[in-house]
């Protein structure tokens, strides 16, 4: 029987506010077994960029990463946000190790080609070194992964945290029974976005497509669910979308084939 592993992705809103960060650290530390944490940090990057006089440009909710912005996100994601989380977990007895994709070549990416939009120094994941992560995990290390990768040519690349979580979970599913948890500001996928208790407990691909056609699921939840189904089809055992405060309670929406 294969060992179980939980990959948890948390957004910047959770890790950038003291109260929600403290709860996350406590809840994550309480999760037993092997685990990996992937975090965002976009709001902090926008704030620091503004303080440095650098304008943040967004298209369809995604950051345009020019050379100056790349310096900011590298500092903020790989430094400020990541090390705050690592220090907090160490204080709770979790042997956390902060990583970007460049560290030990754990995630290699390719710079996104220019199509309708030039996103700049943004990376699309090519390879995750699952054996390296597994070696760390078996030594009792808990990887804490920032949303940064590299191209192997000396360039850092800004990379979507949802994508890093999904690609990491898929790669590790060759070695573990992986549960991928996307933490969100809602209790799960909702039938009615104005009713926080209208959680859909389970959702299949066919049901998802029908919900999209009916307008029940829309906006940013669509790519999140697309990533979830892709992970399931690639061998991830289970995908859950839930509140960050519910990660230890086994609640939320479960994604089924």
From Swiss-Prot:
InterPro entries attached to this UniProt entry: AceGlu_kinase-like_sf, AcgluKinase_fam, ArgB, Asp/Glu/Uridylate_kinase
One Gene Ontology term of the molecular function aspect: acetylglutamate kinase activity
CC annotations in GO: cytoplasm
GO biological process: arginine biosynthetic process via ornithine; L-arginine biosynthetic process
Listed pathway(s): Amino-acid biosynthesis; L-arginine biosynthesis; N(2)-acetyl-L-ornithine from L-glutamate: step 2/4
Keyword RNA-binding applies: no
Site (Transition state stabilizer): 9, 224
Uppermost EC category: transferase
Location in the cell: Cytoplasm
Domain of life: Bacteria
EC number: 2.7.2.8
Reactions catalysed, as given in the entry: N-acetyl-L-glutamate + ATP = N-acetyl-L-glutamyl 5-phosphate + ADP
Keywords associated with the record: Amino-acid biosynthesis, Arginine biosynthesis, ATP-binding, Cytoplasm, Kinase, Nucleotide-binding, Transferase
Keyword Nucleotide-binding on entry: yes
Ligand binding (substrate): 41-42, 63, 158
UniProt similarity note: Belongs to the acetylglutamate kinase family. ArgB subfamily.
Function comment: Catalyzes the ATP-dependent phosphorylation of N-acetyl-L-glutamate.
Protein name per the record: Acetylglutamate kinase
């Amino acid at each position: 029987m294969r060992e179980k592993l939980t990959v948890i992705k948390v957004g910047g809103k959770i890790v950038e506010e003291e109260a929600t960060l403290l709860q996350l650290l406590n809840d994550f530390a309480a999760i037993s077994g092997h685990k990996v944490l992937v975090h965002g940090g976009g709001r902090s990057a926008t704030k620091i960029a503004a303080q440095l006089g650098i304008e943040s440009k967004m298209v369809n909710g995604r950051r345009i990463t020019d050379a100056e912005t790349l310096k900011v996100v590298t500092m903020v994601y790989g430094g400020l946000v990541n090390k705050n989380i690592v220090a907090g977990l160490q204080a709770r007895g979790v042997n956390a190790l902060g990583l970007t994709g460049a560290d030990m070549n754990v995630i290699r990416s390719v710079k996104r080609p220019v199509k309708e939009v030039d996103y700049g120094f943004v990376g699309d994941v090519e390879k995750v070194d699952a054996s390296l992560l597994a070696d760390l995990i078996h030594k009792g290390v808990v990887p804490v992964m920032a949303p940064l990768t590299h191209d192997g040519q000396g360039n850092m690349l800004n990379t979507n945290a949802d994508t890093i979580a999904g690609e990491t979970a898929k790669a590790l599913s060759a070695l573990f029974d992986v549960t991928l948890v996307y933490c969100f500001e809602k209790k799960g996928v909702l039938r009615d976005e104005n009713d926080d208790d209208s959680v859909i407990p389970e959702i299949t691909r066919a049901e998802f497509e029908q919900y999209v056609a009916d307008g029940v699921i829309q906006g940013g939840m669509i790519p999140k669910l697309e990533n979830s189904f892709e992970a399931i089809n690639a061998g991830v055992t289970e995908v859950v979308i839930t509140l960050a405060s519910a990660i230890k309670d086994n609640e939320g929406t479960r994604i089924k084939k």
